[in-house]
């Protein structure tokens, strides 16, 4: 009598490279985002005067502006308390993301997304601590309408947030 082994009796094989990733890998990626963000901010701060704008294309300028608030200058004129509020919020969010990275190491897209958010949050926290505001320098526009200036950290946060939505939609679709 031939021995048959049912599929359920065999140990599950893991052929998933994502399982081998570690939180340190994702944190290193976040650190790369921070380094790129801070590098470009330092270059802009050293070569531009406040408010200076240099055209790059017909829809993009490099500028040097400061944001004491959050996205779209939310609470920028709130009197100063917002610097420490957003600094504290960035630190809390960063700590939460590190915890998430330890809990979900096998979820590559999720970890990639939150690593981008972590790097962006840390980049902007550094600005708030060092300068008292966030340094923004990317200015996209169409005719006379200018999108609020932003930076590499903001790009990372935005792309990370979009990827989190994509990851969640993929997860919901599977179930």
From Swiss-Prot:
UniProt pathway = Protein modification; lipoprotein biosynthesis (signal peptide cleavage)
Active site per UniProt = 136, 154
UniProt record, GO biological process: proteolysis
Matches recorded under Pfam families: Peptidase_A8
Topologically, how does it sit relative to the membrane?
Multi-pass membrane protein
Transmembrane domains' residue ranges = 25-45, 56-76, 81-101, 110-130, 146-166
Report the catalytic activity.
Answer: Release of signal peptides from bacterial membrane prolipoproteins. Hydrolyzes -Xaa-Yaa-Zaa-|-(S,diacylglyceryl)Cys-, in which Xaa is hydrophobic (preferably Leu), and Yaa (Ala or Ser) and Zaa (Gly or Ala) have small, neutral side chains
Give its localization: Cell inner membrane
Any one GO molecular-function label of the UniProt entry:
aspartic-type endopeptidase activity
By what name is this protein known? Lipoprotein signal peptidase
Upper lineage is: Bacteria, Pseudomonadati, Pseudomonadota, Betaproteobacteria, Burkholderiales
